Regions:
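Acidic/His- and Gly-rich active-site-bordering loop/insert found
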Residues: 2-120
Length: 121
């Protein structure tokens, strides 16, 4: 299976990287109300990505930012359930002077992607 995934990524690397960069360009800073629309746009982007991957996906509105729920139930009732839990928002990028490139413009340096939200701890 790992070989299949590697082959798939190799064959689609430019498209996959482009989609990731599109997502990383969204300043989904949930801690700042001026980015509420951006945060919703990130949720909508994620829902669309799930749908393109064949999942049933929806946004669930909350008192805060929407939850993105996606599911794929074709494996069969006798198969285990897998839950992936994460977040699509980011923290503020300040202080900006510590960035070598704009935080919401993905940049590749030394084979690594630099952008706000490209990794998490």
């Amino acid at each position: 299976m790992a070989t299949d995934l590697t082959a798939h990524f190799d064959a689609n690397a430019d498209r996959i990287r482009g989609e990731l960069f599109d997502f990383l360009r969204i300043p989904s800073v949930s801690a700042r109300s001026e980015h509420d629309a951006d945060t919703r746009r990130a949720a909508e982007w994620l829902r669309g990505a799930m749908q393109r991957a064949g999942l049933r996906a929806e946004l669930l509105d909350t008192e805060g930012h929407p939850v993105v729920l996606g599911e794929w139930r074709q494996a069969g009732a006798d198969k285990p359930t897998v839950l992936v839990y994460g977040h699509y928002d980011v923290q503020p990028a300040e202080p900006l002077e510590l960035w070598d490139s704009p935080p919401f413009e993905p940049t590749v340096r030394d084979g690594r992607i630099y952008a706000r939200g490209s990794v998490d701890d």
